[in-house]
Amino acid sequence: MAPRSFWKGYLKLSLVTCPVVMAPAKSEKEKLRFHTLNRATGNRVQSRYIDSVSGKPVDSADQVKGFPRDDQSYVMLEDEELDSVALESARTIDIELFAPADSIDWIWYDAPHYLTPGDEVGEEAFAVIREAMKATKMVGISRLVLYRRERAVLLEPRGKGIILWTLRYGDEVRDPKLYFDAIKDQKPVPELLSLVNRLIEERVKPWSPEMASDPVQDRLRDIIEAKKTPPAKKTKAEEKTGKGSAESNVIDIMDALRKSLGPAAKKPKGR
């Protein structure tokens, strides 16, 4: 049984339209979430919007969006004004243009979502759009309101479905030249490069989700389980001093690489 979708609408390309459903590709189900408590009482703490000058609570009906001016005052914007600049339809993914799939750098990709046909009637139109993108090695570009924000989205054919990626806005991604241009153009020593290549080859494994597991979540669960049943007698953990022999700041890269590769990486005789 497929998981429940969180969005229903239409996929449109020119005159071709079909109903679709969408669900986030990433799950927050396993992520631990905490409440803020009052240490003295153990009760939950509630947050409220307070006027920064008067200190009085502000009801939701009196809350309004504001854009700061240079003189520290604000331009107030009502909900109707914000709605006037939004998309006409928040329920239609209208593919406006296409781009070569290999022309978009991964840094623009934000969050993935699974897009599937909404019913049996729309499966044919969905398949036509999907297979056409596969055949031409193109991805579709559109706009959509998601999470209360208008987003640029990318549609990528994947298997029998389509992955819809939200994209970062143009001004959200910094120019890498600002950071990388200052790096000196150094050519590595061939022998060093050869050793690193061997080190990489020894550590190659097929991708699996375990490679991106979150050890912090597991450690937090262990702490929570331990606190549920506290030990009869508390023991004081020994503090780690962190003392040890000071390592030299200058490391012989060649020697370090040979040690990483083991006995097989020792210098041949006669060198």
Swiss-Prot record:
Q: Which organism is it from?
A: Methylocella silvestris (strain DSM 15510 / CIP 108128 / LMG 27833 / NCIMB 13906 / BL2)
Q: Entry's InterPro entries?
A: Ku70/Ku80_beta-barrel_dom, Prok_Ku, SPOC-like_C_dom_sf
* Record flagged with keyword DNA repair: yes
Name this polypeptide is given: Non-homologous end joining protein Ku
Q: Which family does it belong to?
A: Belongs to the prokaryotic Ku family.
Q: Which GO terms describe its molecular function?
A: double-stranded DNA binding
Q: Which positions fall inside the Ku domain?
A: 12-194
**Which UniProt keyword terms apply here?**
DNA damage, DNA recombination, DNA repair, DNA-binding
Subunit notes for this chain? Homodimer. Interacts with LigD.
Main function: With LigD forms a non-homologous end joining (NHEJ) DNA repair enzyme, which repairs dsDNA breaks with reduced fidelity. Binds linear dsDNA with 5'- and 3'- overhangs but not closed circular dsDNA nor ssDNA. Recruits and stimulates the ligase activity of LigD.
User: What ranges does the record give for the region Disordered, renumbered to this chain?
Assistant: 225-249
**Which gene does this sequence derive from?**
ku
Name the Gene Ontology biological process terms. Answer: DNA recombination; double-strand break repair via nonhomologous end joining
* Organism taxonomic ancestry: Bacteria, Pseudomonadati, Pseudomonadota, Alphaproteobacteria, Hyphomicrobiales
